[in-house]
């Protein structure tokens, strides 16, 4: 039985817990949560979700714990991870989902506290490995202690990049993620170090940065230096789409690109990348468990070598499923 703690019970932390609850894997037990607020608030936010709706179990709380279906989960509000009682609680894995402890030095604070491994739900620095399932999960090793799951956007497109590069050879490319707003934006016009993210999230189209394109090269090293991109934040709470345009070496057609991707989604990427051939919109993919859903209706090819593809993704729930998948892979080692 793996004992798991979740550090940061925000959008991703709560969904990771929900997915663990839904899967009912007998080998995983969430024993602790650390977040800088009170248990009443955490219980309410777990129970009610504006996007993913009401939690499927019974949620109660005490001063120092959450109680889900009668099972107690210890709750802490400690800003310094090195002071958390991971050793006393026998914590094997920490899901690091604060967005704060993203480099090796900070993530190691959990190890100092007694945890055995840390899974970071964001791009990281100094990690042992960045894992995107569908690309390089076979490189996970038992000795890895600090693991990054990259970003939701990287997960949405990297497996597709890998397939396209293997089949057609990517020369260069640009991606744009049209991304729902997140809590790293302001609800109203208020200060932010990114002056565009300082503007009201629900009433603006907001161009900003993404490291997703360059991060793809961490898991598909063959395209290192060949991709870049940007993000456009839009006034939706969840559901995003990554638009990728690449120049390829081998001439192709729309039909061939779609056939190659359909084969991949039914084979090695089954359950990771979905395939769509209907005129869907973003709300249609909320609650889907895929890292991305390849949209065959959007595929375009000009001159045989300029290829555009698109991948829908639930940037919260789909990504959180991959985090739990990564945890389950580590359990088997």
From Swiss-Prot:
Q: Give the reactions, separated by semicolons, that this protein catalyses.
A: D-glyceraldehyde 3-phosphate + phosphate + NAD(+) = (2R)-3-phospho-glyceroyl phosphate + NADH + H(+)
- Cite the binding residues for NAD(+): 11-12, 35, 121, 183, 315
Family matches, as InterPro entries: GlycerAld/Erythrose_P_DH (IPR020831), GlycerAld_3-P_DH_AS (IPR020830), GlycerAld_3-P_DH_cat (IPR020829), GlycerAld_3-P_DH_NAD(P)-bd (IPR020828), Glyceraldehyde-3-P_DH_1 (IPR006424), NAD(P)-bd_dom_sf (IPR036291)
Supply the SUPFAM superfamilies for this chain.
Glyceraldehyde-3-phosphate dehydrogenase-like, C-terminal domain, NAD(P)-binding Rossmann-fold domains
**GO BP terms, alphabetized:** glucose metabolic process; glycolytic process
Q: According to its UniProt record, where is this protein located?
A: Cytoplasm
Annotated keywords: Cytoplasm, Glycolysis, NAD, Nucleotide-binding, Oxidoreductase
**GO CC, any one term:** cytoplasm
Which residues participate directly in catalysis?
A: 152
This entry's Enzyme Commission designation comes to 1.2.1.12
Say which domain of life the source belongs to. Bacteria
Query: Which EC class, in a word?
Result: oxidoreductase
Q: Name one Pfam family in it.
A: Gp_dh_N
Q: In which pathway does it act?
A: Carbohydrate degradation; glycolysis; pyruvate from D-glyceraldehyde 3-phosphate: step 1/5
Binding-site residues for D-glyceraldehyde 3-phosphate, renumbered to this chain: 151-153, 182, 197, 210-211, 233
User: What is an example of a GO molecular function annotated in this UniProt entry?
Assistant: NAD binding
Identify the residue position(s) of the site Activates thiol group during catalysis: 179
Its job: Catalyzes the oxidative phosphorylation of glyceraldehyde 3-phosphate (G3P) to 1,3-bisphosphoglycerate (BPG) using the cofactor NAD. The first reaction step involves the formation of a hemiacetal intermediate between G3P and a cysteine residue, and this hemiacetal intermediate is then oxidized to a thioester, with concomitant reduction of NAD to NADH. The reduced NADH is then exchanged with the second NAD, and the thioester is attacked by a nucleophilic inorganic phosphate to produce BPG.
| Family note | Belongs to the glyceraldehyde-3-phosphate dehydrogenase family.
What PANTHER family does the annotation carry? GLYCERALDEHYDE-3-PHOSPHATE DEHYDROGENASE 2
| Subunit | Homotetramer.
Descriptive protein name: Glyceraldehyde-3-phosphate dehydrogenase
Please report the organism this UniProt entry assigns to the protein. Answer: Thermotoga maritima (strain ATCC 43589 / DSM 3109 / JCM 10099 / NBRC 100826 / MSB8)
């Amino acid at each position: 039985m793996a004992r798991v703690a979740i550090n940061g019970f925000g959008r991703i932390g709560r969904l990771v817990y929900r997915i663990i609850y839904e899967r009912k894997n007998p080998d995983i037990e969430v024993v602790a949560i650390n977040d800088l607020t009170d248990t009443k608030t955490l219980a309410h936010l777990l129970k009610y979700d504006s996007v993913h709706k009401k939690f499927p179990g019974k949620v109660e709380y005490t001063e120092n714990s959450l109680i889900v279906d009668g099972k107690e989960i210890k709750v802490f509000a400690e800003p310094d991870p090195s002071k958390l009682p991971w050793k006393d609680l026998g914590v094997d894995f920490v899901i690091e989902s604060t967005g704060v402890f993203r480099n090796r030095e900070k993530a190691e604070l959990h190890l100092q506290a007694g945890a055995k491994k840390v899974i970071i739900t964001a791009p990281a620095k100094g990690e042992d490995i960045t894992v995107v399932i569908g690309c390089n999960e076979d490189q996970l090793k038992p000795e890895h202690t600090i693991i990054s799951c990259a970003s939701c956007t990287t997960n949405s497109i990297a497996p597709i990049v890998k397939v396209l590069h293997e089949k057609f050879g990517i020369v260069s490319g640009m991606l744009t993620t049209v991304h729902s707003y997140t809590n790293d934006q302001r609800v109203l016009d208020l200060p932010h170090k990114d002056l565009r993210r300082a503007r009201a999230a629900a009433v603006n189209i907001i161009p900003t940065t993404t490291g997703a394109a360059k991060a793809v090269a961490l898991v598909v090293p063959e395209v290192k230096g060949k991709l870049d991109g940007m993000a456009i934040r839009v006034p939706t709470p969840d559901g995003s789409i990554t638009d990728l345009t690449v120049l390829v070496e081998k001439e192709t057609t729309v039909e061939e690109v779609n056939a190659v991707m359909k084969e991949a989604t039914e084979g090695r990427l089954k359950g990771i990348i979905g395939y769509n051939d209907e005129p869907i919109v973003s709300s249609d993919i909320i609650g889907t468990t895929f890292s991305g859903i390849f949209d065959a209706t959007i595929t375009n090819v000009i001159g045989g070598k300029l290829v555009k593809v698109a991948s829908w993704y639930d940037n919260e729930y789909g990504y959180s499923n991959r985090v739990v998948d990564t945890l389950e892979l580590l359990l088997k080692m």
